[in-house]
Amino acid sequence: MVMSSYMVNSKYVDPKFPPCEEYLQGGYLGEQGADYYGGGAQGADFQPPGLYPRPDFGEQPFGGSGPGPGSALPARGHGQEPGGPGGHYAAPGEPCPAPPAPPPAPLPGAPACSQSDPKQPPPGTALKQPAVVYPWMKKVHVNSVNPNYTGGEPKRSRTAYTRQQVLELEKEFHFNRYLTRRRRIEIAHTLCLSERQIKIWFQNRRMKWKKDHKLPNTKGRSSSSSSSSSCSSSVAPSQHLQPMAKDHHTDLTTL
């Protein structure tokens, strides 16, 4: 039985109360009065037992060797928190459960999960796709021939002669205004041109030469000469027949 601090004090005077038997005889207490109120002699600081059994831990004084002021001590009575994560309360003889182990630290050689893959582009940049080249975007050259081309003949572009090629062609035109087939092939191989290009250049150069020298067109001159000759041939027989008809008329009159 816990003694009250007031009773320990020598100056405290114990009050005089009648014994419990007088209360029972007088009918003040019921059947359970003596048993129910029998513990009235307990001290004033008496506290009822908690709902859960109190663990038997030795209380350590607040000193240098004990835990600091920040460490939490188990509370008494109703406010006792559960000992484990699953609501398990430690019994007086059961040891305190160990705290959960921390997660393992990542290895220094292994890359972290948050680091992005260097092969993958960042989300903000768009993927570069190859440019699409359509047929109409391709330039058609004269010297390049596509063997797989099955469409119509492409439009020929104008040939740009170099200064060396023009000089050699002018020298050849100065000596010969008309080329033979053999000489045309030789010049084409020498100047890295085709026979058709040599032929067209000489045709244009001859037309320019005739224009510079103001020579008449040979085709027009030949046609005019042929027409005049045909007219003269048709007029001559008629003139020859007229005197013969006149002589024949005079002969008839004389008779």
Swiss-Prot record:
Pfam hit, one: Homeodomain
Organism (species): Gorilla gorilla gorilla (Western lowland gorilla)
Entry similarity comment: Belongs to the Antp homeobox family. Deformed subfamily.
Gene that specifies this protein: HOXD4
Motif (Antp-type hexapeptide): 133-138
Keywords of this entry: Developmental protein, DNA-binding, Homeobox, Nucleus, Transcription, Transcription regulation
DNA-binding region per Swiss-Prot/TrEMBL record: 154-213
Official protein name in the record: Homeobox protein Hox-D4
Recorded superkingdom: Eukaryota
Any single Gene Ontology cellular-component annotation: cell junction
GO biological process, alphabetically ordered: anterior/posterior pattern specification; embryonic skeletal system morphogenesis; positive regulation of transcription by RNA polymerase II; stem cell differentiation
Stretches with biased composition (Pro residues): 94-109
GO MF term list: DNA-binding transcription activator activity, RNA polymerase II-specific; DNA-binding transcription factor activity, RNA polymerase II-specific; RNA polymerase II cis-regulatory region sequence-specific DNA binding
InterPro entries with a match to the protein in the record: Antp_homeobox_Deformed_sf (IPR050609), HD (IPR001356), HD_metazoa (IPR020479), Homeobox_antennapedia (IPR017995), Homeobox_Antennapedia_CS (IPR001827), Homeobox_CS (IPR017970), Homeodomain-like_sf (IPR009057)
Residue stretches of biased makeup (Basic and acidic residues): 245-255
PROSITE patterns assigned to the protein according to its UniProt record, in alphabetical order: ANTENNAPEDIA, HOMEOBOX_1, HOMEOBOX_2
Main function: Sequence-specific transcription factor which is part of a developmental regulatory system that provides cells with specific positional identities on the anterior-posterior axis.
Ranges of Low complexity composition bias in the record: 222-234
Self-association and partners: Forms a DNA-binding heterodimer with transcription factor PBX1.
Stretch list, region Disordered: 31-128, 212-255
Compartment(s): Nucleus
Main location as per UniProt: nucleus
